[in-house]
């Protein structure tokens, strides 16, 4: 319509988040809002080929829905079907990465849009809620992990409390979503229009050519630094340096084995959970994964955790020098790099006795 530029397109992280967004729209109405669910993460278009971009369904869908014309430089939004683009990603580190990838896409393909005040906005939700029961009942909301960690370390000892981790928007109930949409001053944040030097900061975060500079960027991070979510308008440079950087740091931690024990965090959780439950008898992989998830507060998908268990038990040539778990069943072969392992509900495992020698009993749970 002629007033389409007054509307907002909400991008959600998957279908479950889409239903949460629709529940929230019951508060503000649907006349000026549309929703589209992203399937996973967007393509990093900065170093992608034209063929990759043209074949990417997410990017092509956004361009079609918004009415964007390829390579056109926009100075206003009057010709668009939606005049605002709202990112409604999860509040975890991967959600921050999705926000960054969207900024990277716009800056690379349609930089003029980021220069338009109020075009790009985000909807934030708590990642952790703390329920205080004593000395008085109270609920605290935290929108990032450093903020919660500071409260836990400095103030929590004065209270009797419990907490709930919100892995994604799907964790929130319909009533909670209606509460969020009823308080847009707190949950709706506008990105400040792109400033002169901010394109270089975006390039630093996403260009393959900036790998060495990115290492130095990560090295200079000061622990505890986080984005101030009380701001109504967020500078893109602040988002990159104080929120997106947390994803990059977390991605390194979960992807690079630690020099102390050669394990990644999820592998360490598997060993810890196995010792805690004294898993020295055959246990189904799917069952063991459930034990570990409960014992270690694992917040990601069950399939990834089950695959980690399988990986620690693989004994074919070219895999573990010492397999910390004993494989009982088809755990994969060298021919496929272990990808031909049977489903986790069919195979069993238990701790290798050598694991007790490798990991000091004083360090065990």
Where are these regions (language model features)?
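Conserved phosphate-chemistry cores used by DNA topoisomerases
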Residues: 1-365
């Amino acid at each position: 319509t002629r007033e389409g530029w007054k509307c907002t397109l909400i991008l959600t992280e998957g279908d479950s988040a889409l239903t949460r967004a629709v529940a929230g729209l019951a508060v503000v109405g649907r006349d000026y809002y549309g929703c589209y669910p992203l399937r996973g993460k967007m393509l990093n278009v900065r170093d992608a080929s034209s063929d990759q971009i043209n074949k990417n369904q997410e990017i092509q869908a956004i361009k079609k829905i918004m009415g964007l014309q390829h390579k056109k430089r926009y100075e206003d939004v009057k010709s668009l079907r939606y005049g605002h683009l709202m990112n409604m990603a999860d509040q975890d580190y991967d959600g921050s990465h999705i926000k960054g990838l969207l900024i990277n896409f716009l800056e690379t393909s349609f930089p003029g849009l980021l220069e338009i005040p109020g075009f790009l906005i985000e909807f934030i939700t708590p990642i952790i809620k703390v329920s205080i029961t004593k000395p008085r009942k109270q609920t605290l909301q935290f929108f990032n992990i450093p903020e919660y960690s500071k409260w836990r370390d400095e103030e929590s000892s004065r209270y009797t409390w419990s907490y709930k981790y919100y892995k994604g928007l799907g964790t929130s109930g319909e009533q909670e979503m209606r509460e969020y949409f009823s308080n847009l001053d707190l949950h709706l944040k506008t990105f400040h229009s792109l400033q002169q030097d901010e394109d270089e900061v975006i390039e630093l975060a996403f260009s393959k050519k900036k790998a060495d500079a990115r290492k130095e960027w990560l090295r200079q991070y000061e622990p505890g630094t986080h984005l101030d979510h009380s701001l109504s308008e967020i500078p893109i440079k602040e988002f990159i340096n104080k929120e997106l950087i947390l994803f990059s740091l977390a991605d390194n931690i979960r992807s690079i084995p630690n020099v102390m024990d050669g394990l990644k965090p999820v592998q360490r959780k598997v060993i810890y959970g196995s010792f805690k439950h004294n898993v020295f008898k055959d246990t189904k992989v799917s069952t063991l994964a459930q034990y570990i998830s409960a014992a270690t507060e694992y917040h990601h998908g069950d399939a990834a955790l089950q695959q980690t268990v399988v990986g620690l038990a693989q004994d074919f040539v070219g895999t573990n020098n010492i397999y910390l778990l004993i494989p009982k069943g088809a755990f994969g072969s060298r021919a496929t790099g272990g990808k031909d392992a049977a489903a986790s509900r069919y195979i069993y495992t238990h701790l290798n006795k050598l694991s007790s020698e490798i990991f000091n009993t004083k360090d065990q749970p």
